[in-house]
């Protein structure tokens, strides 16, 4: 599924990025594929699990909760990123007891035949990582979500290269409106961006000359009915289109992974034409999901709406003071909404001036960039209450945005998506003071 793969390396089993149940990014992303029915058993038997970064389509707490109930001491390996991958472990309530943080660029020896090395991303070193796994001298390179894996220094002629291909992992431009953001502009932008990504990936594969290329991760869908607009607008790249582009330009063999299918790398390296090298899913295997268990996950989000902290409007000052972003000329209007992004009757609607972290009743008279963020009330309150990162809102398509002028405020978004404090606001003492 998505970024999760089960590797059998001699007598060792290794699993990448297990997201096998529940949503990612609050309620915005759901699994495209139906995981094999024995996924939990197989995950519990893993000798090691690699989790590339903290985004919830790679670090899936619903999945890890199930795993921890069976085997809390399963060995998990993560890179030593500036923001710890498991920064939110205590809050999550998931009991995992064998998380190993390893330095970048150093081989980790598993046994005499197997070793792996975690590498950082050149563009998002504070968060993203990728991995090289080597078994008996044969290398598997999984670049995961890295924009510039290992700063562009990558091994040539690996046995297998895996790299993301789909695009669409951002709220931009689907969740934007006003100004140039017409439906025609969005459609054209998305089409152009996806094509650029395909060509970039095909060129990377051509340059690195792996024996086999596998398009992965990128298998998610915006399946909640309330997100129909996003699903229809946010067109993803088709893995087969990328594979065809690669075949046109090089001798590289390609393989699109599906649940229940197997790539026998040992056989394929001996003879790329071996018909037993790629085993298709057994007859009758369900490949794509056609139903998702929305209820329990939406209930968790909904539980935040009526929380006591939101009875006191002073939560706003408390929260943004905790967040710690200021001295930046930007005024943001935050509006709580219903499912359809219409202002919620009785919901909060307020201004934050980040120049001096004040909360004015109207926009200041000085010149200032302005952004309006409408957020579904269940998600914004869940995020506020638990001190979560705003990826849930932005990458999860849970906001609608307008901005004037039309510029991306990198410092603002980077702070709320990566740099928030590691512990949530102290709502307990807030309530004692407010009570």
UniProtKB/Swiss-Prot annotation:
It holds the Pfam family Lactamase_B_3. Keywords: 2Fe-2S, Cytoplasm, Electron transport, Iron, Iron-sulfur, Metal-binding, Oxidoreductase, Transport. One of its GO terms (molecular function) is CMP-N-acetylneuraminate monooxygenase activity. Binds 1 [2Fe-2S] cluster per subunit. One of its GO terms (cellular component) is cytoplasm. Pathway: Amino-sugar metabolism; N-acetylneuraminate metabolism. SUPFAM superfamilies: Metallo-hydrolase/oxidoreductase (SSF56281). It is an enzyme of class 1 (oxidoreductase). Its EC number is 1.14.18.2. GO terms for biological process: CMP-N-acetylneuraminate metabolic process; N-acetylneuraminate metabolic process. Transmembrane segments: none annotated. Its cofactor is [2Fe-2S] cluster. It is found in: Cytoplasm. The keyword Oxidoreductase applies. PANTHER family: CYTIDINE MONOPHOSPHATE-N-ACETYLNEURAMINIC ACID HYDROXYLASE, INACTIVE CYTIDINE MONOPHOSPHATE-N-ACETYLNEURAMINIC ACID HYDROXYLASE. Sialic acids are components of carbohydrate chains of glycoconjugates and are involved in cell-cell recognition and cell-pathogen interactions. Catalyzes the conversion of CMP-N-acetylneuraminic acid (CMP-Neu5Ac) into its hydroxylated derivative CMP-N-glycolylneuraminic acid (CMP-Neu5Gc), a sialic acid abundantly expressed at the surface of many cells. This is Cytidine monophosphate-N-acetylneuraminic acid hydroxylase. It comes from Sus scrofa (Pig).
